[in-house]
């Protein structure tokens, strides 16, 4: 989460947390299959690495790859279904972040992201893959440990505005697509019972910061689809 304790995967939630990491470095690997009961080739893969530069700062990098698997395209021509081939659409991001403690309890981070989206249909000459750049700006607060009745406790909070950047252009002359600019805000409390047992209470809110598509109707008020605002 955006406000939970730092871990190897903080790059995708709140890179500012790395400044409070207890380890000097770490690596994360994950593989998440999608719709595994229906298909076996849709998945999300991640690899991450972070390293603390000193007690106040750290850097991290990450690679994320999403595969939509093999998709068979067909076209209905003159009453017959014509095979248009198999496509393997995918998306990839490459991140780099830097986090710095501005005080003993507060840190901020900035991250840069290269985005590559290959969702084109090969038989359509007007479409192509698209790329863009995104920036994340995040902050993290972690209080000093204090007494809460008979136990120790601390408070954490965080905010991350991610994917600030230009839109993707899949087709020349067509409307561009927004990248998913998003804001996460969260806070929580950790209660320590002993060295091995911690109880945490956290809440988080997320808001997509791009325009909502508007419905398009014909003259008889039949829904034709949705249009993305400029």
Describe each region flagged by the PLM:
Residues 1-230:
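Subset of outer-membrane beta-barrel
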């Amino acid at each position: 989460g955006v406000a939970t304790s730092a871990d190897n995967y903080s790059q995708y939630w709140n890179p500012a947390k790395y400044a409070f990491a207890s380890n000097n470095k770490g690596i994360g690997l994950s593989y998440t299959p999608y719709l595994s009961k229906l298909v076996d080739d849709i998945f999300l893969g991640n690899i991450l690495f972070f390293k603390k530069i000193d007690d106040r700062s750290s850097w991290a990098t990450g690679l994320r790859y999403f595969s939509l698997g093999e998709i068979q395209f067909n076209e209905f021509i003159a009453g017959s279904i014509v095979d248009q081939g198999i496509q393997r659409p995918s998306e990839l991001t490459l991140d780099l972040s830097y986090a710095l403690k501005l005080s003993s309890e507060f840190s901020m981070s900035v991250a840069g992201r290269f985005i590559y989206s290959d969702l084109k249909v090969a038989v359509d000459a007007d479409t192509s893959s698209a790329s863009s750049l995104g920036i994340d700006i995040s902050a993290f607060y972690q209080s000093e440990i204090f007494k809460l009745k008979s136990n120790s406790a601390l408070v954490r909070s965080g905010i991350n505005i991610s994917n600030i950047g230009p839109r993707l252009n899949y087709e020349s002359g067509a409307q561009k697509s927004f990248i998913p600019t998003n804001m996460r805000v969260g806070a929580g409390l950790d209660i320590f019972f002993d060295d091995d047992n911690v109880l945490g209470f956290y809440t988080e809110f997320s808001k997509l910061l791009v325009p909502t598509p508007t419905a398009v109707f014909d003259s008889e008020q039949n829904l034709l689809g949705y249009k993305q605002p400029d």
